[in-house]
């Protein structure tokens, strides 16, 4: 019975996302009949500020936000939190640095994907095709990692098998991405971002209660693990690691295709400016709260790492199970699942657009063979399904 209670909230959430995507498909029929590629891959450039902010934040966050990051924070302490703080400005920089410029260029050349911009800028089909191949190859690998991480967390928290979780949210994310397209992904991403924030708040409350309150938790950490309160964590967080991580997760993420394409999709300048502000607050809340939860979980899971499977990836699943009732644990699991599927859906759509729009349609265009809107629809849906499966 407890296992059923664990799975019900997540299943209900996934069905809600599927319903939203089906609704988006019905409301987008007219636009897709006019220009399927533009509506399916960038939502017809109609995203408002709130949805743009939430979809960018949800896409940037992943299962590591809930599992890997907090797990490392359990070992290192506040030093990992200080490292993670650079992620607060990511959305502001992505939309602020690339957003407006990429939007102006995309509208001028009628670009639908980032690779369209590369092809127009460098006049090189070879470069564009290579970029498409790289995107598909690495995005597929990333999607596998996301699914595996979420499925293992699902198994640890709910008691259901790894394959059950993988099949359940794997199939649903493929279906809703396929039928909803970019607009469906954007709206469901917004729901996922909200679910992540709610889940983190519940988990934080559960952790505080299980640990006897903030003062008791911090008293234990300061007494038993004082190194966790130091920025360098007594050598565990050297300056070189700070610099490399700040560059990697703060600067180098600016050009991620799945994030940059959001700059092609927004409605107007007002939407962009609103998204920069909202997105910064949201990603800051998700990243910092999740990492901080990892730190305070040290006051709940007080044993050595060998007691928890000798892996930091086991820390958060065990902490969730020990801190919350089965029902609330099932609610919390929505957060990591939402982080996973919001990332996977964006990667899936980007990979599909790379194959259909950037490679196949370009080859046909060079041969002066025009594809009908219906053909583009079938190829796009087919590519999304095949890549997802």
Q: Predicted regions span which residues?
A:
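Selective recognition of specific alpha-helical transmembrane segments in multi-pass small-molecule
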Residues: 16, 132-145, 195-208, 243-254, ...
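Helix-loop-helix module between adjacent transmembrane segments
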Residues: 82-177, 245-250, 338-345
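Membrane-water interface regions at transmembrane-helix termini and the short interhelical loops
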Residues: 1, 72-78, 98-104, 149-157, ...
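Hydrophobic alpha-helical segments and their helix-loop junctions in multi-pass secondary transporters
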Residues: 18-32, 96-99, 139-147, 151, ...
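Loop-to-transmembrane helix boundary motifs in multi-pass membrane proteins
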Residues: 121-129, 136, 356-389
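Membrane-interfacial loop-to-helix junctions in multi-pass transporters
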Residues: 45-50, 122-129, 158-168, 233-239, ...
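Membrane-interface helix-loop-helix modules in multi-pass membrane proteins
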Residues: 39-110, 241-253, 259-261, 265-305, ...
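Membrane-interface "cap" regions at the ends of multi-pass membrane proteins
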Residues: 1-67, 180, 205
């Amino acid at each position: 019975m407890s296992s059923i209670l664990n799975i019900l909230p997540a299943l209900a959430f996934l069905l809600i996302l599927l319903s939203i995507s089906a609704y988006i498909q019905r409301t987008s029929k007219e636009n897709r009949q006019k220009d399927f590629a533009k509506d399916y891959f960038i939502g017809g450039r109609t995203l408002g500020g709130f949805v743009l902010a939430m979809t960018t934040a949800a896409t940037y966050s992943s299962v590591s936000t809930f599992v890997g990051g907090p797990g490392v924070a359990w070992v290192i302490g506040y030093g990992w939190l200080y490292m993670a703080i650079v992620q607060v400005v990511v959305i502001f920089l992505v939309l602020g640095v690339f957003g407006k410029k990429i939007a102006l260029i995309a509208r001028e050349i009628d670009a639908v994907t980032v690779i369209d911009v590369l092809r127009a800028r460098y006049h090189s089909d070879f470069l564009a095709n290579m970029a498409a191949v790289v995107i598909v190859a690495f995005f597929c690998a990333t999607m596998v990692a996301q699914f595996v991480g979420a499925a293992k967390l699902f198994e640890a928290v709910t008691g259901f098998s790894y394959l059950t979780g993988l099949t359940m949210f794997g199939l649903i994310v493929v279906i809703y991405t396929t039928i909803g397209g970019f607009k469906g992904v954007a709206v469901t991403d917004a729901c996922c971002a909200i679910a992540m924030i709610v889940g983190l708040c519940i988990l934080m409350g559960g952790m505080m209660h299980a640990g006897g309150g903030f003062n008791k938790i911090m008293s234990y950490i300061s007494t038993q693990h004082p190194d966790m309160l130091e920025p360098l964590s007594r050598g565990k967080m050297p300056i070189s690691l700070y610099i490399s991580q700040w560059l990697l997760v703060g600067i180098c993420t600016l050009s991620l295709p799945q994030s940059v394409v959001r700059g092609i999709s927004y409605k107007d300048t007002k939407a962009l400016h609103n998204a920069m502000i909202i997105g910064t607050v949201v990603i800051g809340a998700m990243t910092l709260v999740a990492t901080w939860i990892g730190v305070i979980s040290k006051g709940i899971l007080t044993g050595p790492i060998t007691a928890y499977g000798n892996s930091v990836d086991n820390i958060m699943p065990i902490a969730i199970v020990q801190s919350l009732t089965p029902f609330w644990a099932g609610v919390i699991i929505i957060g990591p699942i939402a982080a996973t599927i919001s990332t996977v859906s964006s990667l899936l759509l980007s990979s599909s657009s790379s194959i259909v729009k950037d490679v196949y349609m370009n080859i046909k265009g060079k041969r002066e063979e025009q594809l009908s809107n219906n053909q583009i629809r079938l190829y796009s849906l087919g590519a999304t399904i095949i890549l997802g499966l």
